[in-house]
């Protein structure tokens, strides 16, 4: 096995960048080549069908099934011209991945031959086995039926030879079994609630859109090295491995020159993303070695979520073509930064006005303050739920370290906006809001023009920071489906806006002028949500104490954090907005607890296997060599000289015995702890047992393995080390 390690390292050093040819000179020439977008709809659909479908997409009109056959026929013609032979309903089950079943465009022609067929019925709806996906008890093997239904608001696309149709996935009894269905409901709820409030300022606005811009972080590891690490292969992270002497301490990787093999991968990924209509814009090295980031231009939230899921799928496929494996786990390597997926969220009108951006007039600024303060209120009232929406067995390794936001949800606003809110809070009159524009900064360098400085600085320790025209939710993990966080956030904002309008309308009915009523309720909200505002160091221990004093959710146990979904205020929020029922929330929590348990269970099994089949045998083999050396020293030197000369080896022999004894003892205890936990029938209690009794042992055992790695002869160590995983590119 040790020979394999050195063989894959040597092979990795000789790999060359894969040549990637651009399909055209300008990206705009091949953008959305494989997407059935409006341009293709206009070309392949009858004009009346096109108009009805656009009404569904833009205005949320109910899909008229009478046009389904014409739409399906147009899609089929377009797809066949691209060489497509199959179609699939592409959906997002509660596994945090995507699912698809491919069917061919073929049917019997009744004459012994075949013909290409794709009907409106097949486009709009298909049946699937709901019991074979995580469902929290909603579906059983004996009542397994589930349905996937087309989402026209997210365009159909082609991958390889398959037409992919974005769909929702629901049970036969109507409950959602995916992320898309509740996301669409949450977006509908925030549209209606925000539109009602927006009409105070502009009655002509017809629609409010929730926007999302994600930032996807990831690691790349050479495929050979990846294959030689069973823990990476099976869990997505290293369960052992001592830190390399050099990691990220020189701060030389962030924004550094992109390695040639990685650059080729990035170029390939960008081309294929653009061809699928994903507007990728930014690529760069991240902080940790072999860590990188990809970010697109922001899009409508539902489409952005679909595009992120598609990008993660593309990354996995394209990485292999370049001799890499992509790691999307939030913390694949100990001692260096983990990977997140910042969610840049905002609301805007269908005419292009961003509601989270300051305006040019006092009334526009009041509108801006109104939506910002209502967002803060939503985050304050449901800070525990927002934390639950991003929590997982994998993301828990990243949160709370001095590299990512803490596991306490708070919001950073910046100096200027904080002053404005403080002024409004303390003011006793109804003066309208005035905000300054960007300030200039001269650098006194002749070649450099004056810089325009933003009104907000950046606080990297804040989980929910205002960044000028949007809020940046930094807590979501790199592996997660953005929909989870977006469902919670948009629903919370919708509920708050409904409550806000109710209070304003009550004042107006009592004779209060509209602007005065808005300012009074905004002032009340500013006072109430003040505990969520924090501009200081989120990493400090003082903040943990202060956050608890403010009544913020400071829980750190992942399974317990999930309880926030089932709090009365959470159930009331989801049900009142029509996003999810109590039954759906209970089912999703069952899935979350079960998923947590299984991930820790798999890690424990893998670590136990590695210990007994790799680590301990190698340590004993090296120890045997040292013992043999000590015996031979006795035959060459006097007993006193041999004792002196062998003292260091004898100390190492003893140290190896201590480490291996501890490891074997605690692996046995970990197996027993798993057996005890597995007998618990409640998914919640089982997950808590795994968190409290099994997960801590992983770190305890790892400590002793990592000590052995430093002791054992490097030539004998079988598993690729951190210096190879992180620096071989």
Feature roles, as predicted:
Residues 14-120, 124-140:
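Histidine/acidic residue-rich metal-binding segments in metalloenzymes
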Residues 67-71, 91-93, 121-122, 169, ...:
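Active-site-proximal loop/turn and secondary-structure-junction residues that shape catalytic pockets
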Residues 143-328, 337-340, 347-590:
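Glycine-rich, acidic/polar active-site loops that bind/position phosphate-bearing ligands
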Residues 96-113, 128-131, 229, 236-238, ...:
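Short linear, low-complexity motifs centered on an aromatic residue
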Residues 2-45, 200, 207-225, 230, ...:
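Active-site-facing alpha/beta catalytic cores
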Residues 2-24, 132, 141-155, 162:
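N-terminal hydrophobic targeting/anchoring segments and the immediately downstream early-domain regions
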Residues 67, 91, 119, 296-298, ...:
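Active-site proximal loops enriched in glycine and acidic residues that flank catalytic Cys/His/Asp
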Residues 524-729:
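C-terminal amphipathic alpha-helical interaction region
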């Amino acid at each position: 096995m040790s020979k394999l390690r050195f063989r894959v390292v040597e092979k990795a050093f000789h790999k060359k960048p894969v040549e990637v040819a651009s399909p055209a000179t300008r990206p705009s020439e091949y953008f959305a080549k494989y997407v059935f977008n409006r341009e293709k709809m206009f070309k392949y659909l009858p004009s009346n069908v096109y108009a009805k479908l656009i009404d569904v997409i833009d205005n949320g009109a109910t899909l008229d099934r009478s046009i389904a056959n014409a739409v399906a026929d147009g899609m089929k013609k377009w797809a066949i011209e691209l060489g497509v032979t199959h179609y699939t309903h592409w959906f997002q089950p509660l596994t945090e991945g995507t699912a698809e079943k491919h069917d061919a465009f073929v049917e019997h022609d009744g004459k012994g031959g075949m013909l290409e067929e794709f009907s409106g019925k097949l486009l709009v709806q298909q049946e699937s086995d709901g019991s074979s996906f995580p469902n929290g008890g909603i579906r059983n093997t004996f009542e397994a039926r589930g349905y996937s239904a087309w989402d026209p608001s997210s365009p159909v696309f082609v991958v390889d030879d398959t037409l992919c149709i974005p769909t929702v996935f629901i049970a036969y009894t109507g409950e959602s079994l995916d992320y898309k269905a509740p996301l669409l409901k949450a977006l509908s709820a925030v549209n209606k609630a925000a539109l009602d409030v927006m009409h105070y300022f502009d009655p002509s606005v017809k629609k409010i859109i929730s926007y999302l811009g994600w930032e996807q972080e990831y690691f790349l590891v050479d495929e050979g090295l990846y294959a030689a690490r069973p823990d990476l292969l099976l869990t997505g992270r290293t369960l052992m491995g001592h830190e390399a002497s050099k990691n990220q301490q020189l701060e030389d990787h962030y924004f550094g020159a992109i390695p040639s093999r990685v650059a080729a991968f990035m170029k390939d990924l960008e081309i294929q993303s653009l061809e699928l209509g994903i507007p990728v814009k930014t690529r760069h090295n991240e902080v940790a070695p072999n860590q990188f980031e990809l970010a697109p231009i922001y899009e409508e939230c539902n489409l952005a979520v679909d595009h992120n899921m598609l990008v993660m799928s593309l990354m996995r496929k394209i990485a292999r073509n370049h001799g890499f494996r992509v790691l999307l786990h939030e913390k694949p390597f100990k001692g260096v930064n983990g990977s997140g997926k910042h969610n840049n969220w905002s609301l805007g009108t269908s005419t292009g006005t961003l509601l989270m951006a300051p305006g040019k007039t006092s009334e526009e600024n009041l509108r801006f303050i109104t939506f910002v303060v209502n967002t803060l209120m939503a985050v304050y009232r449901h800070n525990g739920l927002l934390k639950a929406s991003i929590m997982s067995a994998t993301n828990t390794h990243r949160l709370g370290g001095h590299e990512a936001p803490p596991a306490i949800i708070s919001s950073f606003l910046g100096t200027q906006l904080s002053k404005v809110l403080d002024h409004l809070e303390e003011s006793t009159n109804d003066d309208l809001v005035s905000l300054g524009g960007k300030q200039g900064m001269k650098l006194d360098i002749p070649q450099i023009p004056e810089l325009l400085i933003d009104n907000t600085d950046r606080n990297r320790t804040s989980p929910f920071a205002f960044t000028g025209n949007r809020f940046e939710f930094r807590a979501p993990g790199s592996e997660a489906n953005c929909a989870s966080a977006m469902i919670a956030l948009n629903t919370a904002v919708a509920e708050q806006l409904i409550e806000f309008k109710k209070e304003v309308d009550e004042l107006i009915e009592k004779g209060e002028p509209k602007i005065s009523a808005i300012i009074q309720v905004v002032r009340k909200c500013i006072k109430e949500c003040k505990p969520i505002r924090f501009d200081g160091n989120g990493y400090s221990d003082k903040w943990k104490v202060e956050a608890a004093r403010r009544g913020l959710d400071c829980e750190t146990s992942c399974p317990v954090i999930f309880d926030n979904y089932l709090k009365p205020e959470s159930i009331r929020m989801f049900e009142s907005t029509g996003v999810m029922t109590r039954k759906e929330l209970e089912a999703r929590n069952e899935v979350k607890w079960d998923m947590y348990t299984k991930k820790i269970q798999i890690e424990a099994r893998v670590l136990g296997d590695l210990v007994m089949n790799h680590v301990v045998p190698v340590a004993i083999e090296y120890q045997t060599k040292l013992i043999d050396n000590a015996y031979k020293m006795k035959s060459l030197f006097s007993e006193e000289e041999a004792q002196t000369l062998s003292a260091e080896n004898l100390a190492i022999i003893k140290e190896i015995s201590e480490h291996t004894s501890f490891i074997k003892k605690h692996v046995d205890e970990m197996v027993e702890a798993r057996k005890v936990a597995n007998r618990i029938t409640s998914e919640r209690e089982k997950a808590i047992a795994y968190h409290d009794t099994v997960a801590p042992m992983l770190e305890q055992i790892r400590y002793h393995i990592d000590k052995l790695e430093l002791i054992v002869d490097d030539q004998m160590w079988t598993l690729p080390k951190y210096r190879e995983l992180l620096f071989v590119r």
